[in-house]
């Protein structure tokens, strides 16, 4: 009986041990399944709960690279770029200042030619014409005088210079040289040409005289009409042999109208028109010359 009881106890202990092992295995499997499920859930939802704070930060933000200390070459290149930008800015600023009109520079320019009486006279005018590359008797000098509203031929006063050059925005020789074509363009406009033509009479005459000396008149007419009026050589010849010593303003202005309106063969000239006697005599002289 005692041996039977011992056998039963042995079998019972074996079963209990087996059950305990099975229980441990069951709990182990449960833990394994739970961990796997949690890992899958975290992967799907992007959870960072299983990460430490530093690991999580590194996953979200890439690690910062350490800044490399600037080498001598880098500093030199940076300085070179800065200097280049400054030189470019400075040259642009200087160029802008040079292009802008300066009354001070214009005044200094005037005194390169003016005498102690604040007037550019014949000697200064000769040097001035040489500097801008224009002969004194060139018609563009007459246009310039007109723009300056100069009152006496061969002279520019300080006031005339400053007022005229300011309107032209010229304060250096180079700027005026670059403006010469613009001045010549006034001669191509009939209205401006007429203004210049009329101005020339008062500009060239002696201020104590109401008329223009015949020799001065022939020179000025040649300057203004010599290249554009085909009959000018004949008219000049007429003046050479005529008795006229002066030309008044009415005669002067009518010569321009005659050159613009009368045909080269004079066929449309009206002897009964309001032309001055000077032109009546020219027409008669020219017709006689043609017939002889």
From Swiss-Prot:
Glycyl lysine isopeptide (Lys-Gly) (interchain with G-Cter in SUMO2) crosslink location in chain: 95
Record's compositionally biased regions (Polar residues): 45-56
Name of the protein: DCN1-like protein 4
Outcome of swapping residue 250 to A: Does not affect localization at nucleus
Oligomeric form and interacting partners: Interacts (via the DCUN1 domain) with the unneddylated cullins: interacts with CUL1, CUL2, CUL3, CUL4A, CUL4B and CUL5; these interactions promote the cullin neddylation and the identity of the cullin dictates the affinity of the interaction. Interacts with RBX1 and RNF7. Interacts with CAND1; this interaction is bridged by cullins such as CUL3 and strongly inhibits the neddylation of CUL3. These CAND-cullin-DCNL complexes can only be neddylated in the presence of a substrate adapter.
Classification via PROSITE patterns: DCUN1
InterPro entries: DCN-prot, DCN1-like_PONY, PONY_dom
Resulting phenotype, residue 274 to R: Does not affect localization at nucleus
Predominant cellular place of this UniProt entry's protein: nucleus
MF terms (GO), sorted A to Z: cullin family protein binding; ubiquitin conjugating enzyme binding; ubiquitin-like protein binding
GO cellular component: nucleus; ubiquitin ligase complex
Subcellular location: Nucleus
Organism name: Homo sapiens (Human)
Domain comment quoted from the record: The DCUN1 domain, also known as PONY domain, mediates the interaction with different cullins. The DCUN1 domain mediates the interaction with the N-terminally acetylated NEDD8-conjugating E2s enzyme leading to the NEDD8 transfer from N-terminally acetylated NEDD8-conjugating E2s enzyme to different cullin C-terminal domain-RBX complexes; the neddylation efficiency correlates with the DCUN1D5-cullin and DCUN1D5-E2 interaction affinities.
Domain DCUN1: 101-287
Pfam families: Cullin_binding (PF03556)
């Amino acid at each position: 009986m005692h041996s039977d009881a011992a056998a039963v106890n042995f079998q019972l202990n074996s079963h209990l041990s087996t059950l305990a092992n099975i229980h441990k295995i069951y709990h182990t499997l449960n833990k394994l399944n739970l961990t796997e499920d949690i890992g899958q859930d975290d992967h799907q939802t992007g959870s960072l709960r299983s990460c430490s704070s530093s690991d999580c930060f590194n996953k979200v933000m890439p690690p910062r690279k350490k800044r490399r200390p600037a080498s001598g070459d880098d500093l030199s290149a940076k300085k070179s770029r800065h200097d280049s930008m400054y030189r470019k800015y400075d040259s642009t600023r200087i160029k802008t200042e040079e292009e802008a009109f300066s009354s001070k520079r214009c005044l200094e320019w005037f005194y390169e030619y003016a005498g102690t009486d604040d007037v550019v006279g014949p000697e200064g005018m000769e040097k001035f014409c040489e500097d801008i590359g224009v002969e004194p008797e060139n018609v563009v000098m007459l246009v310039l005088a007109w723009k300056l509203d100069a009152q006496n031929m061969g002279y520019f006063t300080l006031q005339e210079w400053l007022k005229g050059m300011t309107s032209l925005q010229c304060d250096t020789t180079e700027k005026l040289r670059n403006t010469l074509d613009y001045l010549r363009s006034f001669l191509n406009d009939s209205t401006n040409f007429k203004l210049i033509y009329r101005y020339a009479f008062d500009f060239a005459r002696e201020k104590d005289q109401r008329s223009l000396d015949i020799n001065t008149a022939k020179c000025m007419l040649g300057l203004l009409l010599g290249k554009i009026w085909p009959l000018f050589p004949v008219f000049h010849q007429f003046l050479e042999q005529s008795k006229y010593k002066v030309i008044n303003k009415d005669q002067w202005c009518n010569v321009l109208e005659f050159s613009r309106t009368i045909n080269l063969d004079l066929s449309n000239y009206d002897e009964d028109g309001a032309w001055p006697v000077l032109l009546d005599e020219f027409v008669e002289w020219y017709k006689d010359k043609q017939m002889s």
